[in-house]
Structure formats: structure tokens, C-alpha cells
């Protein structure tokens, strides 16, 4: 984003004013308001959690009786009712580590993005690959009837990923929150009612 655009970015300004770690908080707030992905008392797994704005929203939605565990390659500062750990979603052992630490989750939220190279085909394929890795972890920890949301770079492989997730959930819906930049190719795949 150009510096001039950043100054005009309404959500970035609001995030700073309201104490969120990034503008991404408003994406999850909007999605949760529309689809009730996270409710009071929920146990939530946040994959790709850094810098932690989704952890902030999840901890608020889950409330005092809820638990949030964030996982990322980078460190994300912990909050009340939200812990974080370093981990790579592509590491085969991470699912077991998360299951031991968290138990069953009521919701899995995933805002993963690769280091963007500028080559759209490569970046899109890499992001979808990360989603498949996250979905494997989700399959290990998400409780039956649980919910999930995944960032998806729209493109060649997005429909295949949506179809894959559609087999695991009662309902799936692709949507673009108002807080997403208009020029961004990102969509969010909301998945409700895990069939376990």
C-alpha cells in the first residue's frame, strides 16, 4: 500500500484508535457478526495468528469462559484468555502438539498468508497449500458441529479448496468483508457445522 493510501485507510486508523494490532480485526468482527463462528465460552484455534488481531477478536467473542490458542511462525504477544505458540502449519507434528495443548476446538480461524513474492501464480498456489495444511490440523482438533473460517486468495485453485471444505461441513460460504481492500483478491471461506 502506498503511504498516502495508508493515511486514508479507515480500518487501519480505527484499529490504532481501538487498540487492535491490525486492521484485520475488523474482518473477523464482521464475519463473526454475520455467521457466529465464535460464541461465548468457545475454545478457538487461530492458525497464522501474528500479529494477533484475530486473537484479540476471538478472545473477546469467547469471553472469560473461552480459550484461544494462536499459532504462527512469528511470535504473537499473548492476551487474557489467549495464548500463543510458535509453529509451522506444514509441520506434520503440529496437529498433535495443538491437540495436546488445546484439546477440542469449537472454532478454527485461519488468516494465513505466505510471504508474497509478487508472482501471483506462485503466491496463490502457496496460500492454498497453506490452507490445506491448516485444514489437516483443523480436522484433528475441531469438534463435531464446530465452525471455521479461512482466508482464500481467489484464483485457479480456490474452487477446489472450497469443494474440499464443502465435504467436511454442513454449510460453506465465500464472502469478502467490507474491511478487505477492494483491490485485494482475498476472500473468506466460512465453514459451519463440521461433520467430524
Curated annotation (Swiss-Prot):
Binding residues annotated for S-adenosyl-L-methionine, in chain numbering: 52, 54, 72, 88, 111
Primary enzyme class: transferase
UniProt keyword terms in alphabetical order: Cytoplasm, Methyltransferase, rRNA processing, S-adenosyl-L-methionine, Transferase
SUPFAM superfamilies: S-adenosyl-L-methionine-dependent methyltransferases
Active site, renumbered: 151 (proton acceptor)
Record flagged with keyword Amino-acid biosynthesis: no
Gene3D superfamilies assigned to the protein according to its UniProt record, in alphabetical order: Vaccinia Virus protein VP39
Position of the signal peptide: none
Subcellular compartments: Cytoplasm
Record EC number: 2.1.1.166
Predominant place of localization: cytoplasm
Molecular function (Gene Ontology), one example: rRNA (uridine-2'-O-)-methyltransferase activity
Catalytic activity: uridine(2552) in 23S rRNA + S-adenosyl-L-methionine = 2'-O-methyluridine(2552) in 23S rRNA + S-adenosyl-L-homocysteine + H(+)
Superkingdom field: Archaea
Gene Ontology CC annotation, any one: cytoplasm
InterPro entries listed in its UniProt record: RNA_methyltr_RlmE, RNA_MeTrfase_FtsJ_dom, rRNA-MeTfrase_E, SAM-dependent_MTases_sf
PANTHER family for this protein: PRE-RRNA 2'-O-RIBOSE RNA METHYLTRANSFERASE FTSJ3, RIBOSOMAL RNA METHYLTRANSFERASE
Entry function: Specifically methylates the uridine in position 2552 of 23S rRNA at the 2'-O position of the ribose in the fully assembled 50S ribosomal subunit.
Entry's family note: Belongs to the class I-like SAM-binding methyltransferase superfamily. RNA methyltransferase RlmE family.
The protein, known as: Ribosomal RNA large subunit methyltransferase E
Protein species of origin: Cenarchaeum symbiosum (strain A)
Amino acid at each position: 500500500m502506498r503511504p498516502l493510501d495508508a493515511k486514508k485507510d479507515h480500518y487501519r486508523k480505527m484499529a490504532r484508535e481501538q487498540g487492535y494490532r491490525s486492521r484485520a480485526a475488523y474482518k473477523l468482527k464482521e464475519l463473526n457478526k454475520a455467521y457466529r463462528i465464535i460464541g461465548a465460552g468457545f475454545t478457538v484455534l487461530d492458525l497464522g495468528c501474528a500479529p494477533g488481531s484475530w486473537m484479540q477478536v476471538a478472545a473477546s467473542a469467547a469471553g472469560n469462559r473461552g480459550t484461544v490458542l494462536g499459532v504462527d511462525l512469528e511470535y504473537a504477544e499473548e492476551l487474557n484468555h489467549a495464548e500463543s505458540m510458535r509453529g509451522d502449519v506444514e509441520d506434520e507434528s503440529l496437529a498433535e502438539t495443538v491437540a495436546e495443548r488445546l484439546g477440542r476446538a469449537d472454532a478454527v480461524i485461519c488468516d494465513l498468508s505466505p510471504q508474497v513474492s509478487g508472482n501471483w501464480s506462485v503466491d496463490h498456489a502457496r496460500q492454498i497449500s497453506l490452507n490445506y495444511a491448516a485444514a489437516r490440523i483443523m480436522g484433528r482438533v475441531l469438534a463435531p458441529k464446530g465452525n471455521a473460517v479461512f482466508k482464500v486468495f481467489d484464483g485457479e485453485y480456490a474452487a477446489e479448496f472450497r469443494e474440499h471444505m464443502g465435504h467436511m461441513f454442513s454449510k460453506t460460504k465465500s464472502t469478502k468483508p467490507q474491511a478487505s481492500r477492494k483491490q485485494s483478491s482475498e476472500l473468506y471461506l466460512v465453514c459451519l457445522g463440521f461433520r467430524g
